[in-house]
Regions:
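N-terminal ordered "arm"
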Residues: 2-53, 57
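Solvent-exposed helix/loop surface patches that form functional interfaces
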Residues: 2-26, 77, 81-174
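Short, solvent-exposed coil/turn segments at beta-strand boundaries
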Residues: 24-29, 50-57, 76-81, 172-175, ...
């Protein structure tokens, strides 16, 4: 496994948790990351992400694991659709019910054709994935009010269910990008390379030491 030249670390601000990503963004993006969180149940989420030089997604692999259960998913574009492969062991729904939460259902999707319009992928709770459209659309250096409406394949955590979601990104200038999805809107602080510094209500980047 090749070493990575960059390391980014975020602390969750909405719950106990953190994310550490190792990456190489010199020619597109290759990233490996680990996110841990206690909400809705204690969970470790590992991912591997690869894009092309234009920052379009080539492959995403995610593994989520908690006490008594484990799930994985792989997403790959295949022509005009997405190939979705999943596996699961144990019983996530039982763990969720024991913690007072509703069941999660199955990982992946029964209708992969619903993802046909998705250009990017998004992983629930991870600020790294907001950088994909920011870099692909060059929003960190775009003129203020430059707006792009996109569809993403959103991977929910811990279920690893995948749903198509419409998102809107708007350049605000001075290292800020507005992110909106449904009724939710927030202004992301990003560095000159488009990596998230602060995602209000979710996470803040911790400087490397």
């Amino acid at each position: 496994m090749p070493t990575m030249p960059k390391s980014l670390f975020w602390a969750r601000t909405d719950t106990a948790g953190a994310e550490h990503a190792l990456l190489d963004d010199r020619d597109g993006l290759t990233a490996r990351g680990v996110a841990v969180s206690v909400d809705p149940i204690a969970c470790t989420c590992r991912y591997q992400l690869t894009t092309g030089p234009d920052w379009t997604v080539r492959r995403l692999e995610v593994e989520a694991e908690g006490a008594g259960w484990q799930r994985s998913i792989r997403l790959e574009p295949a022509g005009d659709r997405w190939r979705v492969t999943t596996s699961e062991q144990g019983n996530l729904d039982a763990a969720l019910r024991a913690a007072g939460h509703p069941p999660a259902g199955l990982p992946g999707t029964d209708e992969p054709d619903r993802l046909a319009d998705a250009v990017d992928v998004d992983l629930g709770g991870s600020p790294l994935f907001n950088t994909l459209p920011v870099r692909r659309l060059r929003l960190a250096s775009a003129a203020p009010d430059t707006t792009h409406r996109i569809t993403v394949a959103w991977v929910l955590v811990p279920s690893l269910a995948v749903v198509p979601v419409e998102q809107v990104y708007t350049a605000l200038g001075a290292g800020r990008v507005r992110f909106a999805s449904g009724t939710f809107t927030t202004d992301l602080d990003v560095d000159p390379d488009g990596w998230v510094l602060r995602y209000p209500g979710l996470a803040e980047r911790v400087p490397g030491r």
